[in-house]
């Protein structure tokens, strides 16, 4: 993979963008598209639209979405634990013990998801599927006041972001759905930029 393309993919995957909180990653896309597009605009919904050869009568659009599943902080209890509401579809069973990041105005705050300890669960509780309201985020706060000094109700939360390469030229990262599709759309525009084509090419 070319260096510029790889750096763009990394930037997308390492930039948080839960649904409703996509502005930061949209800035990444605008900057990248601006290098090769004839024009880059943003519509009222926040869609970033980059175009080459806009005067052509035939138009072709390649689209991807930049948001990812996440959470939003809705409550801080007396112990300083954070409770959240889902943004998108999560399986709570897969969340226990996950490293998370709360994206605050002052910067990222590291957290881990916890629940009632296994040795404290009765037999019936052990058989039940975990629910989101039974899970909390521990940021290491001493109490509610300590947590509230860094976290605000409404702050978005994601899995700890990052990128790991695996065997056979594969990789994993939170948010690959659909940031890889977004990357394909704008990388296609970049690669087509120095080639002759008869249509107006839009990456959205």
Regions found by a protein language model. Give the residues of each.
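N-terminal hydrophobic/helix-forming segments and targeting peptides
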Residues: 1-204
């Amino acid at each position: 993979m070319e260096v510029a393309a790889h750096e763009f993919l990394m930037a997308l995957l390492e930039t948080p963008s839960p649904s409703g909180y996509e502005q930061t990653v949209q800035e990444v896309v605008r900057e990248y598209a601006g290098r090769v597009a004839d024009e880059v605009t943003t519509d009222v919904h926040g869609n970033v639209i980059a175009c080459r050869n806009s005067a052509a009568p035939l138009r072709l659009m390649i689209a991807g979405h930049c948001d990812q599943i996440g959470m939003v902080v809705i409550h801080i209890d007396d112990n300083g634990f954070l409770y959240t509401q889902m943004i998108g579809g999560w399986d709570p069973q897969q969340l226990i013990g996950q490293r998370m990041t709360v994206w605050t105005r002052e910067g990222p705050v590291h957290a881990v998801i916890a629940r009632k300890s296994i040795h404290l669960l009765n037999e019936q509780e052990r058989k039940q599927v975990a629910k989101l309201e039974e899970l909390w985020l521990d940021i290491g706060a001493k109490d509610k006041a300590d947590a509230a000094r860094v976290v605000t109700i409404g702050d978005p939360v994601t899995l700890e972001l990052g990128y790991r390469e695996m065997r056979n030229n594969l990789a994993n990262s939170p948010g690959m759905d659909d940031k890889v599709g977004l990357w394909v759309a704008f990388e296609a525009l970049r690669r087509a930029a120095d080639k002759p084509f008869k249509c107006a090419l839009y990456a959205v």
